[in-house]
Design a protein with these regions (language model features):
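Terminal targeting/pro-maturation regions of precursor/exported proteins
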Residues: 2-82, 109-110, 114, 229, ...
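Short capping micro-motif at the N-terminus of alpha-helices
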Residues: 146, 179, 263, 339, ...
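Cleft-lining beta-strand/loop regions that shape enzyme active-site pockets
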Residues: 31-42, 48-58, 62-63, 115-118, ...
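PDZ/PDZ-like peptide-tail recognition elements
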Residues: 69, 77-118
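Conserved functional hotspot residues or short segments at active or partner-binding sites
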Residues: 336, 343, 347-409
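A residue-level signal for conserved active-site and pocket-lining positions in enzyme catalytic cores
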Residues: 49, 105, 400
Length: 409
């Protein structure tokens, strides 16, 4: 469909949606007594556009297809996590029981197309050198610009052994790469543990902040004294998946008091999550947290809590900026809205969704941190001694270690 048709018909669908949101009846009379933010005045403009389309446009467009696209755009203009699902999409969405094979990509739709937030280490996507910041232009024949985030996530899943083709736009390349990936059953490695400085620095890197991985971190923190560990380096780079409840629990391991996070929405009463001294494990050991642009959601909550409570130094890059609570609203025609109804805030009141977390020590990424090597590392049971490949030294890791070395335990 010509671009002008899409633009004009966007206005048509907005008329209908605004009318629904604001309570306008079939005669154009508002159920409310006062206009809200001038929205009612805009309805007259949209109606005029509709009149011109009906009387002057060159051809009869497919109203259903364009309206669906306009509704997707309306939801996506709110934030990257909100989605509109057509009746067909929502039926497929409800039928998805989870646990399917995946390719190891955490995605967002902040920039129109699907963008890679982070990649699971060792996954098919990781082995294909897909990295955070890459743009997924298409999944098979489906242009990601024209489908919702929920459906993009659904298309990335499938049965083990099945293939999918991604069209990936990479920085500094003019043409997209066609990459074929084979879906595999999701497997997450245990928390990586490495020791530095004669075991005085305990390095921990989870791949996800779920119950199992947070429990692994808990056990390692509890064993620090026995192992002779005196300082902690928590690597949350490219950690984008997990659970906010588990993230709150992880932050509490390092805090005996203070606010961990807050959650608030237009119709969601403000909740404040406070540290419980009985659940704290180590509140005195020096801590440095590594973050980058692939740090999102639960990992951002942890980073913000430790930063604002002055419990840790943050090193790396500004994080992605994701932290909203969603709710699904079913519509009469079988369609649905996935709408952000509340946003998480840091202890200082910054919305994670809008602002992300900015480290006190900014260090640009110069290497794929999953393959970085530090010659001072001491292998542990959970990490075999690596070979010494020719890779660039991880400057973010080096800076974090330097900070910890200079801190008194």
């Amino acid at each position: 469909m010509p671009k002008i048709s899409k633009i004009l018909l966007l206005a048509v669908s907005v008329v209908l949606v605004v009318a629904v949101f604001l309570g306008v009846n079939s005669n154009g009379v508002s159920a409310a007594t006062e206009p809200q933010d001038g929205a009612y005045r805009q309805i007259n403009v949209y109606s005029e556009v509709l009149r011109h389309i009906q009387t002057d446009y060159v051809e009869q467009p497919n109203i259903t297809a364009v309206t669906n696209g306009a509704l997707r755009g309306l939801l996506e203009s709110l934030d990257a996590d909100s989605s509109y699902l057509t009746p067909e999409d929502y039926k497929a969405y409800k039928a998805d029981k989870g646990g399917k094979a995946q390719v190891g990509i955490n995605v967002s739709k902040r920039y129109g197309y699907a963008s890679v937030v982070s990649v699971v280490p060792g996954s098919p996507a990781d082995k294909a050198d897909i990295s955070d910041g890459d743009i997924i232009e298409a999944i098979g024949p489906a242009d990601t610009r024209d489908i919702s985030l929920a459906m993009i996530q659904l298309l990335l899943e499938g049965q083990p052994g099945t293939e999918l083709t991604l069209s990936v736009v990479r920085p500094r390349k003019s043409a997209p790469d066609k990459i074929v990936l084979t879906r595999v059953a999701p497997t997450l490695p245990p928390v990586t543990e490495t020791l530095y400085e004669n075991s005085s620095i305990l390095y921990l890197k989870p791949g996800v902040l779920d119950r199992d991985h947070v429990q692994q971190i808990e056990m390692k923190l509890k064993g620090m004294s026995k192992a002779g560990n005196k300082k902690i380096l928590l690597d949350l780079r490219d950690v984008a998946a997990g659970d906010m409840t588990e993230a709150t629990r992880l932050a509490n391991f390092f805090l005996k008091d203070g606010t961990i996070a807050m959650l608030e929405g237009q119709k969601v009463e403000k909740q404040t999550f406070t540290a419980d001294a009985s659940k704290a494990i180590n509140t005195t050991a020096p801590v440095v947290v590594l973050v980058n642009r692939g740090t999102a959601g639960p990992a951002e909550l942890v980073a913000a809590a430790l930063l604002d409570n002055k419990r840790a130094d943050l090193v790396g890059e500004k994080t992605f900026g994701e932290g909203a609570q969603q709710k699904t609203f079913e519509l009469p025609d079988g369609a649905a809205l996935i709408l952000s109804i509340a946003k998480y805030e840091s202890p200082s009141g910054k919305k994670l969704q809008d602002e992300g977390v900015t480290p006190g020590v900014l260090v640009a990424s110069n290497v794929d941190q999953a393959s970085a090597v530090d010659e001072d590392a001491t292998p542990t049971e959970t990490q075999a001694a690596p070979a010494k490949p020719s890779v660039t030294v991880d400057e973010q890791l080096s800076k974090a270690l330097a900070l910890l070395k200079n801190k008194a335990a």
